[in-house]
C-alpha cells in the first residue's frame, strides 16, 4: 500500500529550480533513503511534504488524502513526524523536557515557541511515562535530567529521534539521522530504525552516509537537480551508470 505519494512537484527559489517535476511513492512499512548531492532538492522535498513551504505545482498525498494547503501542525496530526539537520533541540532544557515538549513541537513550531510558562502550567499534563519510555528506547535513560547541550552530538541525534517519536506518527521523515556521528552510535541508530520498521513504522530518510544507506534501506531514491534519476534496491541503484555519474563519483 502506498502511504505517501509525491506527484510532479515543482518549486523554484529566485528562479533556481529546487524541485523539477519530482515524483515518488513510499510503500507502507518500508525504509526508503533519498540520496543526492547538495542542491538536489532533498530537504526542499521534506519541507514541501510537511507543509513548511508551498510548492509551485504538483501535489502530495498521505494515506490517499491531499496535503496541499494544510498547515504543518495539521499534517503532523495526520501522522507525519520529522527531524531536521540542525536538530532543533532546546539546549538549556533537560533531556526529559525536550521529549515532553516534543509532543507540542510536532504540532507546529510556532506553538512551541509561543507557549509562556509551559513548565509550570502544563507539566502536570505531560506524558512523562511515555517520554521516559522513549528515552529508554533510544538508550538515554541515564541522561534524563541532563541539559541537552551537555550531550555529545551522537546523543543529541538520539534525543532528536526520541522527540520525533513522541507523536507516534506512522511516517517518520529523518533528515541525515547518522550524519557526523561515530560508528557505534551510527549502528545504534540503524538498529533503532529496523526496530521501528518491525513495529509498523514507515521511514523516509535523507542521508549522505552511503554505507548506512546500503545497510538499512529497502529502497534507495537518487535525486539530482530536483528530479528523480534512479530508484530501486541499494545493490542495484549503486551500480546505475546515471547514479555513478551524477553522485557517487
Regions found by a protein language model. Give the residues of each.
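The feature captures the beta-strand-to-loop junction immediately N-terminal to the Walker
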Residues: 35-37
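Conserved ABC ATPase signature
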Residues: 147-151
Amino acid at each position: 500500500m502506498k502511504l505517501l505519494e509525491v506527484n510532479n512537484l515543482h518549486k523554484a527559489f529566485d528562479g533556481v529550480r529546487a524541485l523539477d517535476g519530482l515524483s515518488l511513492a513510499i510503500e507502507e512499512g518500508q525504509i526508503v533513503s533519498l540520496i543526492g548531492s547538495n542542491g538536489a532538492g532533498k530537504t526542499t522535498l521534506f519541507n514541501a511534504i510537511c507543509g513548511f513551504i508551498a510548492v509551485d505545482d504538483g501535489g502530495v498525498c498521505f494515506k490517499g488524502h491531499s496535503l496541499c494547503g494544510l498547515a504543518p501542525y495539521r499534517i503532523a496530526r495526520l501522522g507525519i513526524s520529522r527531524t531536521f539537520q540542525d536538530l532543533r533541540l532546546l539546549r538549556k532544557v533537560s533531556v526529559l523536557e525536550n521529549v515532553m515538549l516534543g509532543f507540542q513541537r510536532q504540532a507546529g513550531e510556532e506553538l512551541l515557541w509561543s507557549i509562556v510558562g509551559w513548565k509550570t502550567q502544563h507539566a502536570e499534563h505531560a506524558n512523562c511515562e511515555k517520554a521516559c519510555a522513549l528515552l529508554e528506547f533510544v538508550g538515554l535513560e541515564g541522561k534524563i535530567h541532563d541539559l541537552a547541550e551537555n550531550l555529545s552530538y551522537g546523543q543529541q541525534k538520539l534525543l532528536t529521534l526520541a522527540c520525533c517519536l513522541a507523536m507516534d506518527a506512522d511516517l517518520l521523515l529523518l533528515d541525515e539521522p547518522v550524519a557526523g556521528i561515530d560508528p557505534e552510535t551510527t549502528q545504534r541508530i540503524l538498529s533503532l530504525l529496523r526496530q521501528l520498521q518491525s513495529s509498523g513504522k514507515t521511514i523516509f530518510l535523507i542521508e549522505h552516509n552511503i554505507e548506512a544507506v546500503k545497510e538499512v534501506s529497502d529502497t534507495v531514491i537518487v535525486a539530482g537537480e530536483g528530479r528523480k534519476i534512479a530508484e530501486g534496491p541499494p545493490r542495484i541503484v549503486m551500480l546505475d551508470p546515471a547514479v555513478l555519474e551524477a553522485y557517487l563519483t
